[in-house]
């Protein structure tokens, strides 16, 4: 029984970590869903700004009486755009918190594993049970999850940091660029892993 204790300590750490991942995945997905309409709003605003830039207000008789209308309209659109950017920044901050929360819990699991690695032995680590994947598999899956959040966050942060009001074409293309990031990712990675450990968590 004493020999089982180190293995049980690692398994207990894994059992604490995966529910945290599940909770954080919910927050991650919710933040990503919130971003879609915001990106569409930003794209539409860029389209409106482009249309206003291309329109020669002085050529429209009804608008000649309002010489500063073009600039006032532009300022109003930019203020609206900055509000949307702030909201996107809030969602990005949620993604960062998820990444950091998952990383800290994964790191804790690996610390516990390293403390007990010599006592547990490689055979026990590689051995799955009828309802439980091997500890080695679960540790690898946690690394996969952590890597997924880290890479996904960085790509999205880089995309949003590239937004410049001087480049309206780039802003109009944002929703498609955002979708490309999602398509390049393994969409169901976290959910698939959580499914693989569901029986283990119920033990």
Curated annotation (Swiss-Prot):
PTM: Phosphorylated on serines by CK2 kinase.
GO BP term, pick one: ribosomal large subunit biogenesis
Intracellular or extracellular location(s): Nucleus; Cytoplasm
Stated consequence of mutating residue 73 to A: Loss of interaction with CINP. No effect on interaction with interaction with AFG2A and AFG2B
Pfam name, any one: CA109-like
Outcome when changing residue 182 to A: Abolishes phosphorylation by CK2 kinase
Entry keyword set: Cytoplasm, Nucleus, Phosphoprotein, Ribosome biogenesis
Effect of residue 134 to A: Abolishes phosphorylation by CK2 kinase
GO cellular component: cytoplasm; cytosol; nucleolus; nucleoplasm; nucleus
Domain of life: Eukaryota
Subunit: Part of the 55LCC heterohexameric ATPase complex composed at least of AIRIM, AFG2A, AFG2B and CINP. Does not associate with pre-60S ribosomal particles.
Function of the molecule: Part of the 55LCC heterohexameric ATPase complex which is chromatin-associated and promotes replisome proteostasis to maintain replication fork progression and genome stability. Required for replication fork progression, sister chromatid cohesion, and chromosome stability. The ATPase activity is specifically enhanced by replication fork DNA and is coupled to cysteine protease-dependent cleavage of replisome substrates in response to replication fork damage.
Name of protein: AFG2-interacting ribosome maturation factor
Annotated gene: AIRIM
